Amino acid sequence: MQKVSAIFTGVLAIVMVAGVAMFVGCQRDQGAIGLTGPAGSDGVAKCGTCHNVSTEVLAKQIQWSASVHATGGHFRSNSTACASCHTNEGFRATMDSGNMVAAPALIDNPTPPNCRTCHNIHQKYDLTDFVNSTTKPVKLMVSSTGATTNFDKGNLCANCHQPRLSKVTPYPTLNGDDLTIVANWGAQMASQAVILRGVGSGAFEIPGSVAYINSSHSTLVPNRCITCHMAPVRGDTAGGHTWKMTYLSSDGITENNYVAGCVACHTGLTSGVGKFDVNKVQTDVEGLIAQLKALLVTAKMLDTTTDRGLAGTFPSNKVGILMNYKLIEAEGSHGVHNPLFVKALLKNSIDYMKK
């Protein structure tokens, strides 16, 4: 009995000590209260700069979802050679490095060009997140003189909307040696920046009867690409973040030209079928393209049914003319971007091929 009592007394003592420690704690008396630190930022207010009751961001996302940037599907081209323009991740990486030729590595989980490609989304969490990710002048890769664009905000577009030098190697020189080229030689896509900048930008300016000068679209339109392709939006069909210049009528078949970005200069112009053919520019250019194509086919430099070239060895001047054809055909505006320059290239090229 005495033994049990001793055990009980010992356990009780341990419990009492533990209880005292629980309420008293092991720390000593606290020191003086320190100075109040700076107030933290209001997270709700910061996020609310963009995430608010406005539907502006949502509207632009909807426009983007209808754009070729979103639907083109080319972001599968995530290799080092293609990712710099076909994926968001590749573009940001090459822009940061200053080398737009190749991404540093194969892009895992690639995404198409999106908000984060052209803007600094979620970097400062304020309105500066919507500033263009770059507006620096862009060196044109096919220019032998190191020409750069001066498109202001449109410089962002010029980074990718230009042909790569690798596609026009060997590069033709005036009256140079014969050149051996492969079937896919030449600027086959995205030549807009070269045509828009015009004189001295990398096209083969073979001498001829027509002087090489630029049109007002090249020299006077502010921000170049942005003014026309991002004009006040028409729902999700044209302008704004669709970047589209055409839209379909309610029949789903008839294609209309969207001229909201043109009317500041071309007063009275209205959207509709064939409205870009001001002063018959497109009609004239399409006729000249057809003439030059026929001459290149006759010279066995171009496939008879496609715009794919034919491998072979040809005079340097004629190789340069083939480059002109591919630059203009791939550019897609049928002369609108720079009418005077394009007509000079075509007419002088045609005259030379007829010799």
Which sequence ranges carry the predicted segments?
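Sec-dependent bacterial lipoprotein signal peptides
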Residues: 1-25
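Compositionally biased, low-complexity segments enriched in small residues
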Residues: 5, 23, 29-32, 301
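Sequence context of c-type cytochrome heme-c attachment sites
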Residues: 26-152, 159-254, 328
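Divalent metal-coordination and catalytic microenvironments
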Residues: 64, 156, 265, 349
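Active-site lining segments that contact anionic ligands and/or coordinate catalytic metals
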Residues: 222-225, 257-262, 268, 318, ...
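Hydrophobic, helix-length membrane anchors
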Residues: 239-284
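Mature extracytoplasmic or organellar-lumen-exposed domains after removal of signal/transit peptides
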Residues: 267-355
